Amino acid sequence: KKRTRKKKPAEEAAPVEEAPAAEASSEEAPAAPRSDYDSARKFSEFPLSPEILKSIAEHGYETATGVQAATLEPALAGRDLVVRSKTGTGKTAAFCIPMVERIGSGDRVTRAIALAPTRELARQVAAECEALCKYKDIRVTAIYGGVGFGSQEQALKDGCEIVVGTPG
């Protein structure tokens, strides 16, 4: 017998706005990305701080991917997004850049939590966030099982603005 999951009625679900499709465009919107992998927009065209732009440039990136071009401005404005895209299209940076940009520096109070499905992905997301935080006074901590909890617990006690973790 096949088991199915019971879905919540739409009125109970949290409101979430989807990012515009890569092909969508309007008169007010910037040029639409050509694909999830490609965009004509440079990171310098987005409302990003000099610290973030410097970190992005040091990693050799100048042009946003299609996913990033479609999501950066709504995410920077604080809108909730649901983004689905293929592997390698820049989704991690698409949510890490606005997350790091919107967090105040140096207060050591957790401001953002990113959940990943695996330990390896949690480590990768934390590493990308740390790279973006290079010129901002923001600490990132990865929390996951399979290793001693002592150093992770100490990092939380010391304070960090971004926690990246995985269940289990």
Description of each model-found segment:
Residues 28-41, 98-116:
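Long, low-complexity, intrinsically disordered polar/charged segments
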Residues 85-89:
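The conserved Walker
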Residues 50-62, 107-168:
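Conserved nucleic-acid-binding Ia/Ib motif block in the N-terminal RecA-like helicase ATPase lobe
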Residues 65, 93, 150:
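Glycine-rich phosphate-binding loop at the start of an alpha helix
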